[in-house]
Regions:
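Hydrophobic alpha-helical segments
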Residues: 1-182
Length: 182
């Protein structure tokens, strides 16, 4: 049970959020509960969708974005996001079970991606206070400065959704995955 309203239909959401939810519905074919919950603040929904959309056009590929989302959700204990990104990782990014397990454990089966995921984990654990060596390792793995910035942005974006879902008890509307099961 959520702690705040979860509009059951697009028309039940605040008027300013309705066109944003229509866009989500058009893109995904449905409106997952995360978006319904965030629609309580049209400004927050617009900000989330804007950053998410911009980063989707960035330098990091979909696989790396999903790997980061899984690692961050695991650290933050967000079952909603673990469930969503396990589903998206398998079905859209084509990550296999071994890769998803590695991501949830803070790494990757791919050597280059392992460095990016490890950096994302360091960002969360150190609250952004990473070392010169942390940054240098990502550069040496072949990531550009644009990709470095995007890793930080993805950590922030995923932390936002983790906190929204955990703070307000968003009902999981994906096949359920538990943080305790990593």
């Amino acid at each position: 049970m959520t702690r705040i309203s979860l509009p059951t239909t697009i028309s039940a959401a605040p008027v300013a959020a309705q066109p944003l939810l229509e866009g989500v519905n058009k893109l995904l074919g449905s409106v997952p509960n995360l978006f319904r919950l965030t629609a309580n603040s049209p400004a927050a929904l617009e900000g989330y969708l804007g950053l998410n959309g911009a980063l989707a056009k960035g330098a990091l590929d979909a696989q790396t974005r999903e790997r980061i989302a899984l690692a961050v959700a695991q650290i933050n204990g967000c079952n909603y996001c673990l469930s969503a990104h396990t589903y998206l990782g398998k079905n859209l990014a084509k990550l296999d079970d071994a890769e998803i397990a590695a991501n949830r454990n803070g790494g990757s089966t791919d050597a280059k991606a392992d460095v990016a995921v490890g950096f994302a984990v360091a960002l969360v654990q150190k609250r952004g206070q990473v070392s010169d060596a942390d940054v240098q390792a990502v550069k040496e793995a072949g990531y550009s400065e644009a990709e470095l910035v995007e890793i930080v942005a993805h950590v922030a974006l995923n932390t936002l959704t983790n906190y929204l879902n955990e703070a307000f008890g968003t009902p999981i509307d994906f096949p359920v995955v538990s943080a305790a099961a990593a």
